[in-house]
């Protein structure tokens, strides 16, 4: 095992039984079939692009946006400065501007998720979207607290299910997710492709997942047809 990550298990067929494949992460959010009027959180909101998808697709009654909001301080984010990325505004100001149409349902929670998430562990969320700091220790912490945030039937979606990004940064999402699925009672319910392979993976507690019914056998169909 590569020492850049802790040892972690591989998934097997039983862990993805019934999971759906989606062309992109927006399709996955829609395809999860969550009811409108729920409660949704996004950990790491950046420039609000996916926040808009979440509120438009899920129509929640409450949306909590967690971030440290320091993006305006970036000196080189893939060739752009924070000043350029956020139109000369502070990160939080930019986000507030972008989310203004939904201000009635949006609650902004500023600060490190290591601390801010702890006040929301009441199992009231229908979905928590995790896209914060991708270093292993941060992902593990966000995931552990997020499991206490979602309802028993709630869904966790992790962005960037990959080990290394195109800038050669090491990500901790795969080890954390795989351990949750193999050792902590979660199952994969969806996987969303991305054109750059920054894919999303959706998890739900195994005891909340409806397993697909087995296809009836020929003998079973004959018995049903004959009333037996």
Predicted regions and their residues:
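S-adenosylmethionine/decaboxylated-SAM
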Residues: 2-19, 27-228
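N-terminal pre-P-loop "Q-motif" helix
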Residues: 24
